Structure formats: C-alpha cells, structure tokens
C-alpha cells in the first residue's frame, strides 16, 4: 500500500443478514445480496480516497436524459446504471452506453459487484429487436453488449447474444460490436459453438482479480476456466481481438497482477484494462488499497512489453470505459 492510501478514517459497518423474508424472484442488492453468500466480508478500515480518485457527478445535459428516456421506452437496461459505474455521467453525456441484456437479475452473488441477484425472469424475445432499434436511433458507431450471468439457461445465454449481434448488424451494418460475456461455466463448448455463428468484433471476458482471491471475490467462477474461454474463442476466431480486465484494491499484490497479465498473453488475450476497485457500499468487499498512478503507469508499460495490442490502465478505467477509443487504438475501428 502506498503512503497516500494509508489514511484510514473509519471502520466499515459489518454486514448482517437482512430480516426481510427471502424472495428468490426479487432483485437483491447491497446487504440483501451479500449477506446470503458463503463468503464472510471482513470489516476493514475505510481508507480515505486519495486526490487522484475523482468521479464526475452525473450531469443533466440533454444527451444524458435522451439516452435514459430511450432506454426506458425500449425496456432496456445498462450496466452503467445497474452496477453504479462512476463514469455514467461522462459516458451518458457523450452519448455512449454499455447495454446489459437478459435482465437485471444475476444468478451469481459476487461481493464486489452492485448488479442485483435473484431468480431471473424469462428472456425477452423482443429484446434483440429493441436493442437494435435503440442503437440505430442513437446512431452509435461502437457498442458494448454485456449481460448478467444466466446459469439457469442451457446455453448460458449465448444464443441471445447472437440474436442481439445479428439484429444490430442488420439495422446498423457499420456499427462495431464488443461483447462482455459471462463465463458460460458448465456449457462452454455449447456457447462457443453458438457464438461461432455470428462472432462479435471484440470478445471481452473479465478475469476481474488474481486467482488467490477468486474464492472471496468471484464465488462460482474459476480462473483457469475464464482463461480457457478466451483462448478457445481465439482459436476459433483468430481475427477477432480478445480482451480482459482486472480490478486492483482487493488485496492483491503488484506481482500477482503482473503474473495474471503474463497468463493473459499465454492465452492469446490481445487487449487489457486495469482500474481501481471502488466499493459500491459498506456491505461489499472493502477497498484494501488505492493504487498510485505511478503503479498504473508501470502496469501499462509492462503490458506493452508483454505484447498487448492495447492497454487502458488507470484509476477510473473500467472495462467498457472509452471502449470505442480502445478498439480504435488497437486497430479494430
């Protein structure tokens, strides 16, 4: 931990189980979500945010509200809103968004994430058409499509991704499409077979953290499986760039991050994002360190030395943040 990140001011409130009756169909967030996972969230001193952590408040310009109105009119969800992304004001203000398909209830309960958990609703058969119309209406040149985990579906939602990609290309043939997919655990080969029908322009799947912290941060996921997903997709689609992202601040070391980056390159991952983890609430995993800008710069330099075609590295970087610029600099658009 750097000296500038060591200013502890208060102790985070420990999570205690909610007294609300459990309803599997309701969307659980914050304490209602994290109190029921088999991972103990250990209270930690709340660190003072350093000067380099600056989040722009959501601005009320016309483009911001235009996007929100169009999304609601088409019954669409963005991960920007559901995950409480700190960059939502900037991105919506510039007319960009990351669309989240297959509902707003995830079958996983990752304690770093603010997306709600619950028994998902049936897939909306009109969503691919509504999504494609929205993208065309907004005249977007580059879009990111992501989703909740859908462990309840036999293909993990792969066919729904393909339907969204193909319909978007039909209405907006010049638009480049990046997908940020779940891990399709237990159905990987089936999902890859389906994605082969209509592959995206960029294939993204986040490793999120170092393998030592997977049990704590990504219950239900597997580090080796996530690497295999990207490597196997690349083997089938050698001309489609692959991408993955990491958070820092969960208790990892710099060397562990570098080791994950080496693993990424050994599994033919082309593009990289690294950003600072910011806890959505006191009921999520605590921030254990704020990484200094000099360290982010070191990660970026090492990334290019390792052969990544593009590395977006910095405190406020998120997987989809300025994804169009990342793709452009990597030669995709």
Swiss-Prot record:
One GO CC term on file: cytoplasm
Cofactor binding note: Binds 2 [4Fe-4S] clusters per subunit. One cluster is coordinated with 3 cysteines and an exchangeable S-adenosyl-L-methionine.
Binding site for [4Fe-4S] cluster 2: 106, 110, 113
Transmembrane segments: none
Identification of the protein by name: Lipoyl synthase
Assigned keywords, A-Z: 4Fe-4S, Cytoplasm, Iron, Iron-sulfur, Metal-binding, S-adenosyl-L-methionine, Transferase
Occurrences of domain Radical SAM core (ranges): 91-309
Presence of keyword Lipoprotein: no
InterPro entries recorded: Aldolase_TIM (IPR013785), Elp3/MiaA/NifB-like_rSAM (IPR006638), Lipoyl_synth (IPR003698), rSAM (IPR007197)
PANTHER family from the UniProt entry: LIPOYL SYNTHASE, LIPOYL SYNTHASE, MITOCHONDRIAL
Main location: cytoplasm
Similarity annotation: Belongs to the radical SAM superfamily. Lipoyl synthase family.
Entry keyword 4Fe-4S: yes
Name of the top EC class for this enzyme: transferase
Annotated spans, Disordered: 1-29
Reported cofactor(s): [4Fe-4S] cluster
Pfam families to which the protein is assigned, alphabetical: Radical_SAM
SUPFAM superfamilies per record: Radical SAM enzymes
Protein's pathway: Protein modification; protein lipoylation via endogenous pathway; protein N(6)-(lipoyl)lysine from octanoyl-[acyl-carrier-protein]: step 2/2
GO MF term (any one): metal ion binding
Residues bound to [4Fe-4S] cluster 1: 80, 85, 91, 320
Superkingdom in the source lineage: Bacteria
SMART domains: Elp3 (SM00729)
């Amino acid at each position: 931990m750097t000296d500038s990140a060591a200013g502890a001011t208060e102790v985070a409130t420990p999570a205690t189980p909610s007294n609300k009756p459990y309803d599997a169909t309701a969307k659980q967030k914050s304490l209602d979500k994290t109190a029921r996972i088999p991972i103990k969230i250990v209270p930690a001193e709340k660190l003072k945010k350093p000067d380099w952590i600056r989040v722009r408040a959501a601005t009320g310009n016309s483009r911001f509200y235009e996007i929100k109105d169009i999304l609601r009119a088409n019954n669409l969800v963005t991960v920007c809103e559901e995950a409480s992304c700190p960059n939502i004001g900037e991105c919506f203000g510039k007319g960009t968004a990351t669309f989240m398909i297959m509902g707003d209830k995830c079958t996983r309960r990752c304690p770093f994430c603010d997306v709600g958990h619950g028994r998902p609703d049936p897939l909306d058969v009109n969503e691919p058409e509504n999504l494609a119309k929205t993208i065309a209406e907004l005249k977007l040149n580059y879009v990111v499509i992501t989703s909740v985990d859908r462990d309840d579906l036999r293909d993990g939602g792969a066919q729904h991704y393909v339907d969204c990609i193909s319909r978007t290309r039909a209405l907006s043939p010049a638009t480049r499409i990046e997908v940020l997919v779940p891990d399709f655990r237990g159905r990987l080969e089936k999902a890859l077979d389906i994605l082969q029908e209509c592959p995206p322009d960029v294939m993204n799947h986040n490793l999120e953290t170092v393998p030592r912290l997977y049990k704590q941060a990504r219950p239900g996921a597997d580090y080796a499986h996530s690497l295999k997903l990207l490597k196997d997709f690349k083997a089938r689609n050698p001309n489609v760039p692959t991408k993955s992202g990491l958070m820092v601040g969960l208790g990892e070391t710099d060397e562990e991050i570098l080791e994950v980056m080496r693993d990424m390159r050994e599994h033919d991952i082309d593009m990289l994002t690294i950003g600072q983890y910011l806890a959505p609430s006191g009921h999520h995993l605590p921030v254990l360190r704020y990484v200094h800008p000099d360290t982010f710069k070191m990660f970026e330099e090492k990334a290019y030395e390792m052969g990544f075609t593009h590395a977006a590295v910095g405190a406020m970087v998120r997987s989809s943040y300025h994804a169009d610029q990342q793709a452009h600099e990597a030669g995709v658009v």
